[in-house]
From Swiss-Prot:
A GO MF label: acetyl-CoA carboxylase activity
Organism: Streptococcus equi subsp. zooepidemicus (strain MGCS10565)
Gene Ontology biological process terms in this record: fatty acid biosynthetic process; malonyl-CoA biosynthetic process
Family membership: Belongs to the AccD/PCCB family.
Disulfide bridge positions per record: none
The protein, known as: Acetyl-coenzyme A carboxylase carboxyl transferase subunit beta
Pathway the protein contributes to: Lipid metabolism; malonyl-CoA biosynthesis; malonyl-CoA from acetyl-CoA: step 1/1
Record flagged with keyword Thylakoid: no
One GO cellular component, as annotated: acetyl-CoA carboxylase complex
Binding-site residues, Zn(2+): 38, 41, 56, 59
Subunit architecture: Acetyl-CoA carboxylase is a heterohexamer composed of biotin carboxyl carrier protein (AccB), biotin carboxylase (AccC) and two subunits each of ACCase subunit alpha (AccA) and ACCase subunit beta (AccD).
EC id: 2.1.3.15
Amino acid sequence: MALFSKKDKYIRITPNNSLKSSVSRNIPEVPDELFAKCPACKHMIYQKDLGPAKICPTCSYNFRISAQERLTLTVDEGSFQELFTDIETKDPLRFPGYQAKLQKARQATGLHEAVLTGTALVKGQRLALAIMDSHFIMASMGTVVGEKITRLFELAINERLPVIIFTASGGARMQEGIMSLMQMAKVSAAVKRHSNAGLFYLTILTDPTTGGVTASFAMEGDMIIAEPQSLVGFAGRRVIETTVRENLPDDFQKAEFLKEHGFVDAIVKRTDLRDRIAHLVAFHGGVS
């Protein structure tokens, strides 16, 4: 008989000797949405400290917000009248999974499409308004987005209204192929007709504004303003660096970089946008 018995390599668990936690199972759970991590300064922030404008109290980073949140921050209470809600995509390519993706985005955002369009008052100034929402398939521009914005410009021409667009997009919607790319030219033509009518068009670039939206109506405003630190560009940074074979500046494609190089007229804090919009619309002969 051996002096020392060999210990088992593993602990055997049976119904009679199952491990029991010494910690109470009634552990309070912290809700997932109680805190938010700032993408810029990496601090964990209590959601209530962000305020309605969703601005980081540590570094002033502007969190991405929904179209409904931006609407609340911008227009006079109860003045918004939504338009063009009956437009549906025909899904021309019968792209696999596209309809399911649309339905999921609608349930998640409460929007029918990636842009909210209508008329509203901002400090008593009546205007045509479009707000793109990056939470809806990254606010990609498909046929419905292009059609809604085009119709908004046509309405603005008929009613002699200024147009204000909050842009945010990942680019053209690949699930709709060439039909998506055609929206760039269609909306740009509507912008030109609105301009020929002597009406004011203001674009507000928000994070992120990229791809076909940047290459068309986002940069065609009579005035172009941007939120601080917004990503604005056409192609991605890595694509450009690979093409030109150069390292780009750290702030490349940021709103501040664009302003420095003359592509943006002004950078305005989110909390100041409502006042700035009202001032610019009134200055350009606004409608009350």
